[in-house]
Amino acid sequence: MFLVPLLAALSLSAPKVAAHGGVLAYSLAGTWYNGFVPYNTPTGQSTIQREWDTYNPITDPTDASISCNINGASLGSAQKSATVAAGSSVTAYWNQWPHTIGPVMVYMANCGGDCTTATTSSLEWFKINQVGLVSGTLTSGTWGMGQLVANNNSWTTSIPSSLAAGNYILRHELLAIHTSNQPQFYPECAQLIVTGGEGATPPASYLVKLPGAYSMSDPGVNIDIYSHETETNYTIPGPAVWQG
């Protein structure tokens, strides 16, 4: 029932929105938060999600926008942050998602202070969840992205229970690889205030910059799945998952 008002708003926006999709809302430990509405002015919008302007993909893994999507700016005084305890579940909801081939990745970054003033490309990101090729082959197997679609265009993960309290940005990313050697990155960011935890922080080996974590030389980025139809292995790009 929560989706109806926002879906109605999205239906009034530009025709481009018919392609691809994006995160329209979050559920954090059972509390619902509407996201930013793209193709609309940020004036009057107040949300935990960082601004993003288009459903179009980022196709260059070194693009400056890859941390939090095209624009990716905070909403200034209208920007919110959701308070959530370490160990809580987080669900992101996409309004639509047509692609089923590719990995789903979830990152976080400690802002070291108020995230509203943070520059996301300067943060150090760590991965808390990823699902790539679950079973089968590259072209006909089950992918994380396929699981997202099957689960009503949603993805649920948990904030590491040991994570130190603080101000964080949560980043969901879909990497669509259905077009040969033309990766499509779809990142979305939201601001959190994490409470509780056990004071743990990921070691340096788990931290990356965005851009900086990916390149076209990565086998999981620059890939032609149709030339390897019987392949049953896929290497998810980026760092290993930090589980706390």
Curated annotation (Swiss-Prot):
It is an enzyme of class 1 (oxidoreductase). Its EC number is 1.14.99.56. Keywords: Carbohydrate metabolism, Cellulose degradation, Copper, Disulfide bond, Glycoprotein, Metal-binding, Monooxygenase, Oxidoreductase, Polysaccharide degradation, Secreted, Signal. O2 binds at residues 178, 184. Residues 1-19 form the signal peptide. Glycans are attached at residues 152, 233. The keyword Metal-binding applies. Its cofactor is Cu(2+). Binds 1 copper ion per subunit. (1,4-beta-D-glucosyl)n binds at residues 39, 224, 226, 229. InterPro entries: AA9, AA9_LPMO. Lignocellulose is the most abundant polymeric composite on Earth and is a recalcitrant but promising renewable substrate for industrial biotechnology applications. Together with cellobiose dehydrogenases (CDHs) an enzymatic system capable of oxidative cellulose cleavage is formed, which increases the efficiency of cellulases and put LPMOs at focus of biofuel research. GO terms for biological process: cellulose catabolic process. Cu(2+) binds at residues 20, 99, 186. It holds the Pfam family AA9. It comes from the Eukaryota. It catalyses: [(1->4)-beta-D-glucosyl]n+m + reduced acceptor + O2 = 4-dehydro-beta-D-glucosyl-[(1->4)-beta-D-glucosyl]n-1 + [(1->4)-beta-D-glucosyl]m + acceptor + H2O. Disulfide bonds join 68-189, 111-115. It is found in: Secreted. Belongs to the polysaccharide monooxygenase AA9 family. Lytic polysaccharide monooxygenase (LPMO) that depolymerizes crystalline and amorphous polysaccharides via the oxidation of scissile alpha- or beta-(1-4)-glycosidic bonds, yielding specifically C1 oxidation product. Catalysis by LPMOs requires the reduction of the active-site copper from Cu(II) to Cu(I) by a reducing agent and H(2)O(2) or O(2) as a cosubstrate. Displays catalytic activity on insoluble cellulose using I-beta microfibril model substrate. This is AA9 family lytic polysaccharide monooxygenase B. It comes from Heterobasidion irregulare (strain TC 32-1).
